[in-house]
Amino acid sequence: MIYGIGTDLVETSRITRLLEKYGERFARRLLTDEEWPEYAKSMQPAMFLAKRFAAKEALAKAFGTGIRHPVSLSHIGVTHDTLGKPYFKFHPELHTLVQNEGITRHHLSISDELNLACAFVILEK
């Protein structure tokens, strides 16, 4: 049974402006410690952050809460399996919410094209 669906679309130029204005502080607020090494190696930092932001915002929409504790940017990690399929890694506090809501599976799709990053999330009970 579907618990929630969320999607988000981010213009990379918006992320570029935030990086120019706030620098590394912006990236630190958006990423988990586990995401940081991949970001540091990225050849396109604005696109990397745009895709991460879109994924995290889409998850917040699927929860129906928006970005608010414990569904916060720093509590949502995005990683991928050996084939490149993206998935979420939840901070323990967020993981507790996932369990309490009876969410058993999540699906994440991320795409980008030129100046846009898009993410789609389905949460299942």
UniProtKB/Swiss-Prot annotation:
User: Among the record's GO biological process terms, what is one?
Assistant: fatty acid biosynthetic process
Domain of life, per the record?
Bacteria
Catalytic reaction(s) noted: apo-[ACP] + CoA = holo-[ACP] + adenosine 3',5'-bisphosphate + H(+)
EC number assigned by the record: 2.7.8.7
Subcellular localization: Cytoplasm
- What's in the keyword line of the UniProt record? Cytoplasm, Fatty acid biosynthesis, Fatty acid metabolism, Lipid biosynthesis, Lipid metabolism, Magnesium, Metal-binding, Transferase
Please give an example of a GO cellular component term from this record: cytoplasm
Alphabetically, the GO molecular function entries are: holo-[acyl-carrier-protein] synthase activity; magnesium ion binding
- Its job: Transfers the 4'-phosphopantetheine moiety from coenzyme A to a Ser of acyl-carrier-protein.
Say which family it is in: Belongs to the P-Pant transferase superfamily. AcpS family.
Could you tell me what this protein is called?
A: Holo-[acyl-carrier-protein] synthase
Q: Which organism is it from?
A: Nitrosospira multiformis (strain ATCC 25196 / NCIMB 11849 / C 71)
Q: What is the lineage of its organism?
A: Bacteria, Pseudomonadati, Pseudomonadota, Betaproteobacteria, Nitrosomonadales
- The protein's gene is named acpS
